[in-house]
Curated annotation (Swiss-Prot):
Similarity field: Belongs to the FGGY kinase family.
Lineage: Bacteria, Bacillati, Bacillota, Bacilli, Bacillales
Changes after translation: The phosphoenolpyruvate-dependent sugar phosphotransferase system (PTS), including enzyme I, and histidine-containing protein (HPr) are required for the phosphorylation, which leads to the activation of the enzyme.
Annotated Gene Ontology cellular component terms: cytosol
Binding site for ATP: 12-14, 266, 309, 313, 410
InterPro entries to which the protein is assigned, alphabetical: ATPase_NBD, Carb_kinase_FGGY, Carb_kinase_FGGY_CS, FGGY_C, FGGY_N, Glycerol_kin
Protein name: Glycerol kinase
Pathway: Polyol metabolism; glycerol degradation via glycerol kinase pathway; sn-glycerol 3-phosphate from glycerol: step 1/1
UniProt KW Metal-binding keyword: no
Residues at which ADP binds: 12, 16, 266, 309, 410, 414
Binding-site positions, sn-glycerol 3-phosphate: 12, 82-83, 134, 244
Amino acid sequence: MKKYILSLDQGTTSSRAILXNKKGEIVHSAQKEFTQHFPKPGWVEHNAQEIWGSILAVIATCLSEADVKPEQIAGIGITNQRETAVVWDKTTGKPIYNAIVWQSRQTAEICDELKEKGYGEMVREKTGLLIDAYFSGTKVKWILDNVEGAREKAENGDLLFGTIDTWLVWKLSGGKAHVTDYSNASRTLMFNIHDLQWDDELLDMLTVPKSMLPEVRPSSEVYGETIDYHFFGQNVPIAGVAGDQQAALFGQACFGEGMAKNTYGTGCFMLMNTGEKAVASEHGLLTTIAWGIDGKVNYALEGSIFVAGSAIQWLRDGMRMFKDASESEVYANRVESTDGVYVVPAFVGLGTPYWDSEVRGAMFGVTRGTTKEHFIRATLESLAYQXKDVLCAMEADSGIELKTLRVDGGAVKNNFLMKFQSDILDVPVERPVINETTALGAAYLAGLAVGYWKNQDEIKEQWHMDKRLNQQWKRKQAKSYMLDGKKQLKQQKLSNNHKQCYNGDKLIIR
């Protein structure tokens, strides 16, 4: 009987189930969106029970539509929106509050207090991260401090914490496995990425009881099995877990030191594999764990851009400039340039390399002659500019000059954006045949654990390029284009509520 690997891709706006075969091909997939909750400005939450329901729904739909029997599944891999935090009652299995999403800024005040107390350097050294509302630790603290009775329950050992991967493994296994992997643990602000353990000093800083935390395991390992009534009577190995961006790095077969990928999803995330060495950043990047496999841990440098695909969604849904995201490419190509219009898409602050949660979005250079086409093109170009800042920081920290950049995510279908990205980076951009690299990465990790694939060399051979977009501009032209934009931004008169900071080649509007 033919066997498949089932990948569960739990994202920020939807859950998906993807079937992969031995050749690393996508056989079938199913998707279900779920509700976004915005209780207050800057807050973003999800109902963890609704997420679980969406996972069950897509599993059933995917297998049914593909006419694949549950017993044909060799293993399950899970990849997830990272940092999003869930706290639930160990006995009832019910969350005590909504999952606080990675985008949410509701713990910004907690972060400010921790910074004021001087914890920043200690956190950076142990976790490779910055004190920011982006990460899980302050979200857990917020729940314990703001949900009535939560702290007492936690201290009595009655509550469990997990990122979304942990929540799904716990549910699929019927509560038998409370685990996470190295990649997800490294995004919590509570995990020492050098000792590979939950860190007591970090937990004391956040006042989070250690008893709440999951066991941390490698990214490719059998963590448990599905219980009968959650998988049609079958006990299928749950065998691979990785945060979405690390899974994409694995799915892109970026196994060699210095290889990098950029994912254009809701946000934009560039990761470079730094091998078994954790490279400390001096340019605003994050040092994170890529994956743990075969007794070894691989590290990565990461640049996190909070707004990418969501900027295109905003043009569509908020500004009503087009009905389908694919139309943005058509509009952008109707004009030869932005005609001096520049967009800073800081809708939820700015991530790498600025890490400013207070900055807000802005546009500059608008005249009476500015058209919808100029505005759309400027928004698309802004995504490429942000990626350029990340790449410069990455090369400076690693000492490695990038030769090519592998790309994935929904926005890579936009040829205008990819060509412009290649020109601005002065690096060829490679788009794979299979764009579902996040789901594929989780499938590969699970498949390796159950012997479905032999090793990473076999996986490497399955990566095939769909299109290579080579830079058309000369390096001098690209640099001139960047500097011209920054000079124009500098010349704009900002309101009294903002200030601008120009540092070398970087401009940030605060």
